[in-house]
């Protein structure tokens, strides 16, 4: 993988990730949003439908794909691309966040994490080395190191110990990745909770080891938005400019805009797909809650500005009807729309950076939603 940086507008960056795959060269234009395909599928969508929304890269989940279908089935197919028939780039997370989410079912030691398999209850073990081996079998174009996702709230001492162990795990991940002869990209993950000095130590340690890109982890885990913005403002300028920056597990449309505003290149989140299944649909001026009875006889499209299959063909009343009847097509049409909304937003962001008018775009984006522009956190202190 290569990262090319074309243009900046303030802290916002316009570039691309370039991947050499057996099927040819693939570019992922950045800033990019990656739909989440936890179990090797973006829920309810064929790969062709996902591609039609504008997605150029997907996220797969190492932890869940390891438990089901497992490495052996994956190897029999070739890799995850062959298994799910998506022959464009795939990023896989390392399983660290899922293990963190298990709470009391897990025990973290220096060696790795022992936990109870949520499917059948058996005790299993995941380590940095094992995560690298699973992701090698998945054929991930971008592999994430195995880390501990520091919870919120956490004391300074806990966040420090957690971050230091994540750094040791980062080195073990790098070593096993190299031993396997993996020619794909490996990203480090910056930890340190809401503490700026810990984030700095984490980044310096990762840069010393050397990675193809750097993710900001341990945000969007319950901390106030102001803390997330402050950490991004602090750490992004210190990440090597020739490497992509990835904000993990984020988020709402506003979070994408705020991330780009602070120098982030890549995002992933289940929000567009999960919200679609729950009838929360993103539109130009906010959200349509399609379950609201006021849409029962509304013959207008979901979003007149949207060019997706759903908006071009169906009314709000039809989407309301499908949801009310529990029809699978409703969830599918909602998902197509929400994914397209996210990709259109990213395309608008990229164009605004190219035209060096990103600050104006931010003002327009919030004005459409009737919201104020959030202040920059560190600028307020000076």
UniProtKB/Swiss-Prot annotation:
Residues 249-255, 273-277 are annotated as: RNA binding. Its cofactor is Zn(2+). SUPFAM superfamilies: tRNA-guanine transglycosylase. It catalyses: 7-aminomethyl-7-carbaguanine + guanosine(34) in tRNA = 7-aminomethyl-7-carbaguanosine(34) in tRNA + guanine. Its EC number is 2.4.2.29. Pathway: tRNA modification; tRNA-queuosine biosynthesis. It comes from the Bacteria. One of its GO terms (biological process) is tRNA-guanine transglycosylation. Gene3D superfamilies: Queuine tRNA-ribosyltransferase-like. Belongs to the queuine tRNA-ribosyltransferase family. This is Queuine tRNA-ribosyltransferase. It comes from Haemophilus influenzae (strain ATCC 51907 / DSM 11121 / KW20 / Rd). The lineage of its organism: Bacteria, Pseudomonadati, Pseudomonadota, Gammaproteobacteria, Pasteurellales. The gene is tgt.
